[in-house]
Design a protein with these regions (language model features):
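Catalytic core of pol beta-like nucleotidyltransferases
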Residues: 1-25, 33-39, 50-96
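Short hydrophobic/aromatic beta-strand micro-patches
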Residues: 46-48
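Conserved histidines in hydrophobic membrane contexts and catalytic metal-binding motifs
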Residues: 28
């Protein structure tokens, strides 16, 4: 699966994620956005929520994405980014 297919799937499922989980914004970053993924690469997704969510909803969203994409997903909240790595991630993220 390539970057464009991942973006298409996320875009198609975004309305459901907005209503179910309070997702405000999703973005792809890491090896898939650079198109340098390997067979064992996970899909790195940056998320912003429009409401407070608990750990169970966060983990449920990750499982939801993994089941739709059929790959392991590394889900990262934009609000939890550390300054050093956050700058790099924000410079490469492609929002869906």
């Amino acid at each position: 699966m390539g970057k464009q297919e991942i973006i298409k799937i996320i875009r198609n499922k975004k309305p459901e994620m907005e209503s179910r989980y309070g997702v405000q914004r999703l973005g792809l970053f890491g090896s898939y956005v650079k198109e340098k993924q390997g067979k064992r690469s996970d899909i790195d997704i940056l998320v912003t929520f429009n409401r407070d969510i608990d750990l169970f909803d966060f983990l449920d969203l990750r499982e939801y994405l993994e089941s739709r994409l059929s790959f392991k997903v590394d889900l990262v909240m934009e609000s939890a980014l550390k300054p050093a790595i956050g700058k790099r991630i924000l410079s490469e993220v492609e929002y869906v």
